[in-house]
Amino acid sequence: MTSIRVALGQLAPRLGDVAANLELHHRAIDEARGKKVDLLVFPELGLTGYLLQDLNAEVAMRRDDERLHDLAKAAAGMSTIVGFVERSDEEQLYIAAALLEEGEVRHVYRKSYLPNYGLFDERRFFGAGSQLRAVDSRLGVRLGLCICEDFWHLPVPYLLAEDGAQILVNISSSPGRDVAAVNDGGLGTANSWRTLMRTYAQLTTCFVVFVNRVGVEESVTFWGGSQVIDPAGDVVFEAPLLDRGLFVTDIDLDDVRRERTALPLLRDERPEFVLHQLERITRDHAGLGDDEQ
């Protein structure tokens, strides 16, 4: 499969209302099926809402939760990514993304970088994930899943691309700065994200699929603006700011091959060099440097 139809589920989840949010997801799945979608992506914590605080434990699910499997069965025939609060066997809570395929929960990724600045307080409630790897999908393409803040840390897109990802998928609950500027054609947060994603797409020669939620929680506005960037860093599709909906676009996976042939950055990458230098830097920070040049 070289052409993939991608759907961006730019939803407005209800805070703490899992049943209502499951219904939103099921409706979007039905709509996506009617549009012959191959890859359907929902936002970070789409099943729960974002500003949960003490509601986290109430809305958390284990990865074998029947409700997740019901979603997976409903989405059979598509590769679907959903955001939820995961409860581990050790009763730790994580912000997570599940890849649903062929009626099963195929893969679960836990958010690696938890912001604790401004209005963000994620470390108070969640554990940080300790695994980052790309995953093969039924589409014949390797996906690299990450969540919101992860994309603001260089190792995440770099490692996923080194692990063979052809599509980087970032699901987000990004609140907006300068929301009043939308009517003037701008939004500070959206502009920052757009620059970030175009840069990573070019440097990794991957497609970037970014899905951000919309809606308001406790006076915090989430701006949407979900988009798809091609491996050359060009915007393939950008959803409207602040509007909910299911937005569909097509991508050609041959663009990855063509761009990597013309610009072989991954071929020329030196992970062993990076690893050696990181080991040196870690030793230096621990006061164990050996004066090696």
Each model region followed by its residue ranges:
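Short polar catalytic/cofactor-binding loops
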Residues: 10-16
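CN hydrolase (nitrilase-like) catalytic-core segments centered on the catalytic cysteine
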Residues: 63-82, 148-246
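Active-site catalytic loop in hydrolytic enzyme cores
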Residues: 63-66, 88-196, 262-265
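Short beta-strand scaffold segments in enzyme catalytic cores
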Residues: 82-84, 95-99, 133, 226-228, ...
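A conserved C-terminal secondary-structure "cap"
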Residues: 256-293
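Extreme N-terminal starter segment of soluble prokaryotic enzymes
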Residues: 1-6
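Short amphipathic alpha-helices and their capping/turn segments at secondary-structure boundaries
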Residues: 23-37, 155-164
